[in-house]
């Protein structure tokens, strides 16, 4: 599931005429950075939700085959991160699935991070497994840290603690978490907190470089980070 329905208000004026997932970084759209990472991890089918200027995204992904794209339409109203997943559940099936934000991406170092995430997944112990980055790996992140990792891999809220990690915009989730949820606007944070309470929110520290692009001013640093990361990978 690729979350691509947001308004991208902070990216104006660029997003006055295009949805944020189609903003290009180093010649590739933010959406394609995420979809290419999914393809590299062996994902054959991805659901992309749309709301703002949706026809541009629909047209952009129409010719993709790796992964094949199904559209979850939110033209009638934004549903936030979790509400969008609830609407898309019939397309996502009964098995655990990836969630990827369309406005962040990363440059892998070694084994692809989404492959590592799948290998780390243990449905017997986990309801949600988050990919995490530390502040040193991040470009464009203006906030604080999100989670602290215990020795057993479980997470709790970091509340900005300097030793905390950032949620890197990719996760694996159990679809049954959303079985009783309403198709109404609500955030994934509700499910993160419920999983923390039950000891079933886990995290995996990513390798490589993590890049988030929130405003037009963030584009140049993002492209510099891509160039640097790709040079280091050679």
Placement of each model-derived feature along the sequence:
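N-terminal nucleotide-binding beta1-loop-alpha1 segment
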Residues: 1-16, 39-41
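Hydrophobic packing residues within well-ordered alpha-helices of enzyme cores
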Residues: 11, 57-61, 222
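Catalytic-core segments of class I nucleotidyltransferases/pyrophosphorylases
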Residues: 96-98, 105, 110-123, 135-139, ...
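Short, well-ordered coil/turn elements that cap or connect secondary structure elements
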Residues: 17, 41, 64-66, 94, ...
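Conserved beta-strand termini and adjacent loop/short-helix elements that scaffold enzyme active sites
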Residues: 51, 72-75, 131, 158, ...
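Conserved N-terminal catalytic core of the sugar/cofactor nucleotidyltransferase
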Residues: 2, 24, 28-101, 105, ...
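Short beta-strand-to-loop element that shapes/binds the nucleotide-sugar donor at the catalytic cleft/hinge
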Residues: 52, 127-146
């Amino acid at each position: 599931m690729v979350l691509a329905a947001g308004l991208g208000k902070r990216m104006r004026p660029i997003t006055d005429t295009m949805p944020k997932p189609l903003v290009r970084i180093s010649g590739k759209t933010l959406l394609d950075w995420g979809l290419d990472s999914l393809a590299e991890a062996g994902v054959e089918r991805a659901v992309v939700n749309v709301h703002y200027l949706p026809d541009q995204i629909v047209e952009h992904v129409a010719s993709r085959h790796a992964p094949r794209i199904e559209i979850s339409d939110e033209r009638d109203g934004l549903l936030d991160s979790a509400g969008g997943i609830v609407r898309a559940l019939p397309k996502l099936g009964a098995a655990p699935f990836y969630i990827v934000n369309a406005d962040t991406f990363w440059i892998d170092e070694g084994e692809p991070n989404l492959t590592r995430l799948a290998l780390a997944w243990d449905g017997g112990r986990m309801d949600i497994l988050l990919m995490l980055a530390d502040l040193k790996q991040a470009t464009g992140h203006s906030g604080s840290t999100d989670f602290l990792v215990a020795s057993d891999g479980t997470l709790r809220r970091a509340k900005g603690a300097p030793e905390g990690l950032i949620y890197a915009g990719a996760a694996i989730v159990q679809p049954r978490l959303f079985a009783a949820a309403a198709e109404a606007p609500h955030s994934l944070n509700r499910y993160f907190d419920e999983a923390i309470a039950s000891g079933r929110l886990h995290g995996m520290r990513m390798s490589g470089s993590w890049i988030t692009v929130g405003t037009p001013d963030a584009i140049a640093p993002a492209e510099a980070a891509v160039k640097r990361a790709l040079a280091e990978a050679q």
